[in-house]
Amino acid sequence: MNAPLVFAGYGITAPEYHYDDYKGLDATGRIVIVLRHEPQENDDKSVFEGRQLTPHAELASKATSAKNHGAVAMIVVNDLGNHPGDPDELLRLNGISGSQEMSITIIQVKPAIIDEWLKPSGHTPDDLRQQIDKDLSNHSFALDPAAHVAMTVDIERIHRPVANVVGLLPGIDPALADQYIIVGAHYDHLGLGQQHSLAPREVGQVHHGADDNASGTSGVLELADAFSHFPRRPRHSIIFVCFAGEELGPLWSAYFANHPPFPIKQTVAMINMDMIGRVSKNKLYVSGTGTSPGLQKLVQDANHVLNFDISFSSSGYGASDHTSFTVKEIPVLFFFSGLHSDYHKPSDTSDKIDAVDGARVVELVANVVQGLDALKEKPQYVKVAEPAHSGTGGGGGYGPYFGSIPDFAEVEHGVKFSDVRDGSPAAKAGLKAGDILIEFDEKKVDNLYDFTYILRAHKPGDKVTVTVLRGTEKITREVTLEVRK
C-alpha cells in the first residue's frame, strides 16, 4: 500500500457532541493519522462525558470511522501529553475487534516518527492535541501531497469451523412439549493464552480451563444424562447445549439465539453454568433472578435441602452466554461459584476442582429445571434496569493496578470485594475480602462502573485515598497504584 497522509485529530465523528475531526477533510484513498483516546479526557467538564471515555475512544470505533470516510489505512499515535509518565508503548492490535475483521489496515507509529512527518507543517502531534483539547476546534489537514507512506502488513487470518453441541430431550406433555428449557455452558477456553490471559509471562503454555469452563460443560453433560434416565420424563422439552466462542464474547450463544432450532419465544428460561467448580465456604452466586417474577423463590425452594449460601443478583446481563438470551427477552439464571486467582491462567487445573460441591451445584440446577418444568405457564420476562455504561479506550484496559476482585452480589451502594490479590496495592493498604468500596479518590462509588472509570482516570504511582465499609465501620486508607501487568 502506498498512499498520501492526512492528520485527522482523534479520528472521531460524534454528532451528539457537535464534534467532527473529519469535517472539511478529504480522507478518500489516504492514510489517516489519529491520536489515541478522545478530546479533553482529563477534563471533568468535557462534553465527552468528562473523564469517562465514551465508545468513540475505542480503536475499533476510530477504525470504523476512518473506513467510512474513505481512508485506506489508519496510523495510531499515543497522545503522550494526556498521559505524562506513561511508557510510549506500541499496542498489540490483534484483539481490538474481537473476531471481527476491520477491513482496514491499522498500525501504530511512535510520536517521534510522526513529529518528522509533520515537521514541514510546523506542527507536532502534541501541539495539535493541545489545540484540539483547548476548545474542541478542528485541526485536521492533509500533509504535503508529495509525502506518501508505503506500508506492507503481512496478516494471515486462519478460519476454522467450530460448532455448538446441542441435544434435545423431548417433553411428554403435548400441550407443553413445544416449549423449551435451555441448559447451557461454554466449552471453549483460551488455548495457549494469546488473548485474554491473565498470566502474560505464561502465554504459550496450555491454559487448561478446568473451572472455566470444563466445570459447567460437565454439568450440562451430567444433567442431560440424569434427565434422560429419570423415571418420569419432563413435560417441557429440554435443550442441552455446549457453546463455543464464549471467550471471544458470547458469539456462538448469540448465533444460537439468533438462529434457534425452534421459535425463540417458545423458551421457558435459559440456565447458564459458567465456573461452578470452585465453591468456597459454601458460597454460590446466582444472577438473573430479576428477569422474571418468582425466579428467586424458585431457586430458594430448590436450595432448601442443599443449603448453599446464595448471593442473588437481579441482572440478566454479564460476561457469559446468558446475556445472549437476555437481549432476546428470555428469563435467565446464571450459576457461578466465584472468581479465583487461577482465573484465565495455566494454573486453572482439574486438581483444584471441588467435585463434591460442583455436583451439589448441578443438583441445585436439576432442582431448578424441575421447578421450571412444573410451571403451568411460561415465566414472564421482566427487563431489569442496568447502570449506564460507556466504552473503554482501545488498548487502555482498566488503567493502573489496584488488586481487588469484585463480588458480583448486589449491594445497595459501592463495590464489594470478594477477594484482594496478595501483594497488590489494595492488599498493601490493608484492604480485605468483604470490604465494600464506597469512595475512591474522594469520589463516590455506587457500582463497579463508577470504580472502573475513576480508576482509569489515574496512572501508576498515584496515591489515592479510598474509603471502605467493613461491617458497619468506615475505614480510610491510602493506596499507591501500580502498573497493571
What are these regions (language model features)?
Residues P346, D373-K485:
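C-terminal recognition in membrane/secretory proteostasis and scaffolding
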Residues M1-G24, S99-G209, E222-D225, H229-R235, ...:
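Soluble metallo-hydrolase cores and metallopeptidase-like ectodomains found primarily
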Residues V6, A27, A66, K110, ...:
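Terminal peptide-recognition signature
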Residues M1-T64, I155-R157, P170, G394-G396, ...:
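Protease-associated
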Residues S218-L221, D225, H229, S341-H389:
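His/Asp/Glu-rich mid-to-C-terminal helical/loop segments that flank catalytic regions of hydrolases
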Residues M1, K23, M102-R129, R232, ...:
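Metal-dependent peptidase/peptidase-like ectodomains
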Residues G50-P55, S61, N82, L176, ...:
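Acidic/histidine-rich catalytic neighborhood of metal-dependent amide-processing enzymes
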Residues F7, Y17-Y22, K45-A63, Q100-I107, ...:
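Second-shell loop/turn segments in exported
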